[in-house]
Structures are given as C-alpha cells and as structure tokens.
C-alpha cells in the first residue's frame, strides 16, 4: 500500500504536504467516479434494451442469432486487448536499457480503435448490461407466467437466457380440439390461429391450458 501511495503523492503534491493528504479518501472518491461510469446505464444501453424486447417476436428466431452478438463482441475485445499487451511488450524489448524509476510501459490512446479507449469500455459494458437484462427478463417472465408459456415456447430461448435445459414432458401438455372458424370466449371472438402459443382460460370450466397446436376435424 505504501509503495502504491508514494508515487501518486510525489507526482501530484508539493513536497511536505504528504501528512495532510488523505490517500484513502482519494481512492474512495476515484472508485465512486469509476463505478458511475462502469455500472451506470446510459440512454444508448436503454435503446438496445428496447431493441432486444422488439426482437423477441414470433418468427424472428432471435434464439439463433441474438446470443452470438455479445459473444462476438467479447471475442473481438479480448483479442484487441491481447494485441495491446503484445505491442506494449514489444515496445519494452525495443527500448533495451531500463532506467530505474522510469515507467516501464507507456500506454497511449493510439493503441485503441480510433484512439478511443472508452469504446472498448463501452463494448464490455454493453455485454454486461445485455446479459443482465436478458437474465432479469427471463426471471420476471417465469415469475409472472410460469415456465411453460409462449415466452419460453422454444427450448433455445431458455438456454439462451439462463443456460437451463427444461425437461418438457409432452404427454402432460394439455390440448384442446377446436371446431373450424371462430372461438367464442367471454364475449370476444378470436381467430383460432391467433391462440397458438397462448395460455387460454376455458369459459365453461375456468381451467387454463396452453394451446400448442390446432387441429381441424
């Protein structure tokens, strides 16, 4: 701790003022500022959250392509950081002699894309936010509607959200046979095709069942 504190005090404070400098308070204040940047949710992240909700639409097969976006970003960012470490190592090798007390490496903005280190931080922040948002959405939908609903019609959706593979017993799935045309429910006329993938409450018995498919006789 003393070895980490002394260079900061020597570089930023006048000689003789070390006793009046509260290093712990300085570190706490710095961490609070960094915490706001790393954990804070910007309007851009909320915009991507809305796009995630809109992509969860029937027919878009989001479970096939959406999980690969954070994965590709993490692989690209990790590769870039590894390249930066390699470049810094080569720069030390090219320097030859090392002067005692001088910084061994000299990182700069030119090592990052477009000279913007914050772009890498934003991409990491984006992946963390998207993973947390998808997991929160999965937990909320299970809590509100249960595991066997139209939100989790595909097993891939559950695997994408939480890594859990449900054991769905098809023999226990309740089915219903509807006559061709319209289904009258509580003074509402609905096309039977619109009921696929929905949880329906029977008007005569009050029982709830999941409409997996429709068969016309």
Curated annotation (Swiss-Prot):
Membrane topology per the entry is:
Multi-pass membrane protein
Annotated GO CC locations: membrane
Main location, first listed in the record: membrane
GO annotation (BP), single: defense response
Residue ranges that the Swiss-Prot or TrEMBL entry lists as coiled coil:
none
Asked whether the keyword Transmembrane is assigned, the reply is yes
- Mark the transmembrane ranges: 35-55, 59-79, 119-139
Quote the function comment for this protein.
Answer: May be involved in modulation of pathogen defense and leaf cell death.
Which family does the record claim for this protein?
Belongs to the MLO family.
Name by which UniProt lists this protein: MLO-like protein
């Amino acid at each position: 701790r003393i070895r980490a504190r002394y260079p900061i005090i020597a570089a930023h404070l006048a000689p003789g003022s070390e006793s009046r400098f509260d290093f712990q308070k300085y570190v706490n204040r710095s961490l609070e500022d960094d915490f706001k940047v790393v954990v804070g949710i910007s309007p851009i992240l909320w915009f991507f959250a809305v796009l995630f909700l809109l992509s969860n639409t029937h027919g878009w097969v989001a479970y096939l392509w959406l999980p690969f976006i954070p994965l590709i970003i993490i692989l690209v960012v990790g590769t870039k950081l590894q390249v930066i470490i390699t470049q810094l190592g080569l720069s030390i090798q090219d320097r030859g002699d090392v002067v005692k007390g001088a910084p061994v490496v000299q990182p700069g903005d030119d090592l990052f894309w477009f000279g913007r280190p914050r772009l890498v931080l934003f991409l990491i922040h984006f992946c963390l936010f998207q993973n947390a948002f998808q997991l929160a959405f999965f937990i909320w939908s299970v809590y509100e509607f249960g595991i066997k609903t139209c939100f989790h019609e595909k097993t891939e959706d559950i695997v994408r959200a939480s890594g859990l593979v449900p054991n769905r017993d098809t023999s226990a799935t309740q089915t219903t046979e509807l006559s061709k045309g319209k289904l009258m429910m509580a003074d509402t006329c609905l096309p039977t095709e619109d009921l696929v993938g929905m949880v329906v409450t029977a008007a005569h018995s009050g029982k709830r069942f999941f409409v997996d498919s429709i068969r016309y006789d």
